[in-house]
């Protein structure tokens, strides 16, 4: 089985998360996408982070697709960093082929992630274009360091079968939603009480 992993705070989850997942399912020919709702992002201020249970329920409501599974795995296995989550999944679920899914905004700062080179060496990565982040992402230290492992976009369906490091930059999905833009200054979610 080919599984895409989309990690994040999902604070709040929104239709772009769903659209990215469905886009990845199709373009990467995945069987499932797992949303890994993190207890907290080490690179972000977590003071306005809603309670994990509320984010999980909201994510389930937004996902609304049997191929998208919402998980709080990181809180269960007590991992803080993506590399630890990936290592645990690969060790426990050896028969699955994982692909890490991230937006271009995350590629732009991927070099700041704990053990980012090891992440790239453990699982193939699909980067979803997020204008206007495209140029910044593709000029980032991580993109430059991993440039020789980049697949042409027309080979995206082969990514899950490639040994890491391997990555692809997927274009064509034009959404400009972000969780940051859907939060009020006090951290509450816009459109909710």
From Swiss-Prot:
InterPro entries named among the record's database cross-references: Cyt_trans-like, NadD/NMNAT, Rossmann-like_a/b/a_fold
Highest taxon, organism lineage: Bacteria
Record keywords: ATP-binding, NAD, Nucleotide-binding, Nucleotidyltransferase, Pyridine nucleotide biosynthesis, Transferase
Coiled coil regions in record: none
Pathway where it operates: Cofactor biosynthesis; NAD(+) biosynthesis; deamido-NAD(+) from nicotinate D-ribonucleotide: step 1/1
Role description: Catalyzes the reversible adenylation of nicotinate mononucleotide (NaMN) to nicotinic acid adenine dinucleotide (NaAD).
Protein's name according to its UniProt entry: Probable nicotinate-nucleotide adenylyltransferase
Source organism: Bradyrhizobium diazoefficiens (strain JCM 10833 / BCRC 13528 / IAM 13628 / NBRC 14792 / USDA 110)
Gene name of this polypeptide: nadD
